[in-house]
Regions:
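Short, charged/polar "capping" segments at the starts of alpha-helices
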Residues: 50-52, 79-85, 155-156
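Conserved nucleotide-cofactor-binding alpha/beta core module
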Residues: 64-116
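Structural motif
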Residues: 44-48, 75-77, 126-128
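Active-site and donor-binding regions of nucleotide-sugar-utilizing enzymes
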Residues: 98-166
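Short, glycine-rich nucleotide/cofactor-binding loops
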Residues: 35, 41-54
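Active-site-proximal region of nucleotide-activated glycan assembly enzymes
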Residues: 8, 155-191
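Helix-enriched interaction subdomains in cytosolic or periplasmic regions
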Residues: 5-20
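Histidine-anchored nucleotide/phosphate-binding helix
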Residues: 49-67
Length: 191
């Protein structure tokens, strides 16, 4: 039957995770910011996403152009507990390993807490898959607006960049998503 100990444990963990997310207050102010007047940005991502280094490179360049400070929090859930070496040179990005989370996948290291304590005008969710640790991290941040791409988290976003809706249309690359959102955030006026 499906009730082996591992399935049972995963079921219990999943129930606790849902409960934890429900208990977290929403710190998102739903206040639109253009890149012109944003002062601080948060980036939450999965370190192992295939094009993440390119996407962060684009974002890094654009944010610097606008004089916006940013912090990034990457979750790296690999079996071998390694970070994405292509991101190691960014001073404002922390990558968290599985062993640096508790049994619920909540990051427990001080750098994560420092990230959560920040106040951000815009938060970019660059992850493309559902993930408790990512969702938890987004909910812990005080931010004006959330920009994202993950269809499963669409209700959390103030700006959801979509693509690849039709069966024939391929989903845009992560780099394309980032370019589209930067373009949009450059055009909009802050409210």
């Amino acid at each position: 039957s499906n009730l082996n100990p591992e399935n049972m444990f995963n079921f219990i963990v999943s129930a606790f995770q849902r409960h934890t997310l429900r208990k977290l207050p929403s710190l998102n102010k739903k206040k639109y910011h253009s890149l012109e007047d944003a002062r601080s940005v948060a980036i939450v991502f999965n370190s192992q996403e295939s094009e993440i280094a390119e996407a962060i490179g684009i974002l890094d360049k654009e944010l610097k152009k606008f004089g916006i400070s940013y912090k990034g929090l990457g979750i790296s859930f690999t079996k071998d507990e390694t970070t994405n070496s292509k991101l190691d040179h960014y001073p404002y990005i922390v990558q968290i390993l599985k062993k640096e989370t508790n049994w619920l996948s909540i990051p427990t290291i001080e750098q994560a807490e420092n990230f959560y304590k920040g106040e951000y005008d815009i938060l970019f969710d660059l992850s493309l898959q559902p993930s408790f640790a990512i969702e938890y991290s987004i909910k812990r941040c005080k931010c004006g607006m959330i920009v994202g791409y993950c269809p499963e988290r669409e209700e959390m976003y103030d700006l959801c960049i979509k693509g690849g809706e039709g069966k024939t249309e391929a989903r845009p690359s992560l780099a394309e998503y980032v370019k589209q959102s930067i373009q949009y955030l450059t055009i909009i006026k802050s409210k």
